[in-house]
Amino acid sequence: MRRIPFFVISSLILMAASLPSESFSQGTNTTRLSSGEADSLYHEHYRNQYHFSARRGWISDPCGFLYYEGKYHCYWWGCAESEDLVHFNEVSRMVHRDVPRGLGCWTGCVVADPQNTAGFGNDAYIACLTLNDAERKNQSQAITISHDHGRTFSYYDGNPVLDIGYQDFRDPTVIWLEESRQWLMVVSKTLESKVAFYTSPDLKQWTWLSDFGPAGRTYRCFECPDFFKLKIDNGPMKGKEKWVLVVSVDWDNEQYFVGDFDGKEFHAEGLKQETGVYVDRGPDFYASRTFKDFDNALNGRVYSIGWMSNWRYCRDLPMTYGKGFWSVPRELSLRDTPDGWRLVQKPKSELTSLRGQQQHYKGRLKAGRTVIKDISQLGNVYEAEVSFDTSASNTYGLNLCVGDGRKLVVTYNTDSHSLVVDRTQVADFSMEKFLQTCHAKIAPINGQLKLHIFVDKCCVEIFSEDGTNVFSLATFAGDNQTGLELFSLNQGTNYRLGVWPLKSIWK
C-alpha cells in the first residue's frame, strides 16, 4: 500500500508527543490524561465517540492484531490494548524505535512466540513487517522483537529475513500452523495481483510454497492479505471450517476467497476470474485484519477490524486530530448460500455495553418524509435497528445525518431488491472524490428488510441481509446534521425502529 514515509510519521509522532497536554509514565509508555484534557481532546470536530482513533497523528492499516496474555493487542505501528475491543488504552505512539534511516516500516503483523521457535525467548512478541527502501526501489520483509509485552520493538540485525528483489512485495500476515509446527506467511506480490505463501520454522528462514492469483478483481493491485479459518454457520457443513483469504484491491476495496489449504497451496472454491466477492460494499473499509488467538481462549470466534478510509482522498480529509479511524469490531462466520460461500459480519456483542435507554417507534409509512423526533439530541452517536415490510411494491428508506440541507440517503426498492447508499449530499466540506454512492442486491428475510446501523460523528456502518452485506462510509457531517427521517414513495408500509444512544468510549 502507498504509505507516508516512516521518517515523516516519526517526526509527526515525536512532535505530538511533546505537546504539554499529555505525559508518559516511564516503563509502560502509557499516556495519562486528566479528565479535562480528555474532554477537550475527544470532543474535537469529527472525532468519533466509539470508533477507535489514535489520540493524535496518522492511523491507517491495522498492522497486526492478536489476542494474548488476556488482552487484544491492536497495532498501526502505534499500539493500543483492549479487554473487550470496545474500550482501548493507547500504550505507544511508535513501537519501532531503531529502524535504520531511509527504511520505511510498512504494513505487517505481530505474533507471540511462547514456544521460542525464533530463539528470542518465550516472552517475545515479534513483528513481521515490510521494509520499504525508496532509494533502492525495493520492498522486503523484516522482523522486530519486543520483550515488554508488545509495546516497543527492537530491530533484528539479521534483517531482511525475506528479500526477493521486488519493488512491490509487501504486507505480510504470519500465522502458526500447529499441524506442521511451522510458521506460514501470506504476502502480496502487489502489481502481479498475487499472494505468495511461505513457510518457516523460526521466522528467520523462509521457504516459498506457492502463489495464488491472479483472481477476482485484478485491475491495479493486491495488498494487505489476511488468511484465517472460519466456521460455517448453516447447512450440512455447519460447525466445520474453511480457509478464507482476504485481499485489499485497487486501494479502495477488499475481496475474499473461500477454500482449502493443503499445507502448500490455497485452493479457492467457486473461483471467478473477472469479478470478486467484496468484504464491504461501502468505500471506506480497507486493509482489515483478524485477531490471531495465541491464548487459545476465544473458542474459535474470529474478530476483524478495518481501516475506515480510502487512499483516493484520505490525505485530504478535514480531521484536526490526525488521519484515520477504525471500524467497529466484527465477528465473522461463513454461510453457504445459493451464490456460494458468503462472509457473515456482525457487530461484536460487547458493543451493547455502550447502549443507553432504547427509543422505539413503529407504524405505517406515509408518502413523503417522516421526521423521527428526539433523535437529533443524540448528536450522531447512536445505534439503530430498523425493519420494513417488503410485501407491497414500494421505494422507501432513511435519511441519516439530516440538517443544514444535507443528509445521507439510504434507499430500498422492493421490486429490484436494490439498496443504495448515497453520500453525495452529506459532508459539510467540498471534495469531488468524496461524492459517491454504493449499492447491493439485498434479499428480504421473512418478508422484511432489516438494517442494523451504527452512526458516529463522522461515519456510518450499515449491516444488512443478516450480515452478508455491509456498507461502511465516512460521512463528515456537520455539527447540526443530527436528524433522522424515514421516507416512502407510497404510503402503507409497516416499519419498526429501535434507537439506542451510545456512550463515548473515551469517558
PLM feature segments, named:
Residues 1-28:
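Bacterial Sec-dependent N-terminal signal peptides
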Residues 14-16, 21, 164, 400, ...:
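Generic detector of low-complexity/intrinsically disordered segments
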Residues 24-171, 176-222, 231-281, 299-300, ...:
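Beta-rich carbohydrate-recognition and catalytic domains
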Residues 238, 251-252, 262-287, 291-507:
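Beta-rich accessory regions
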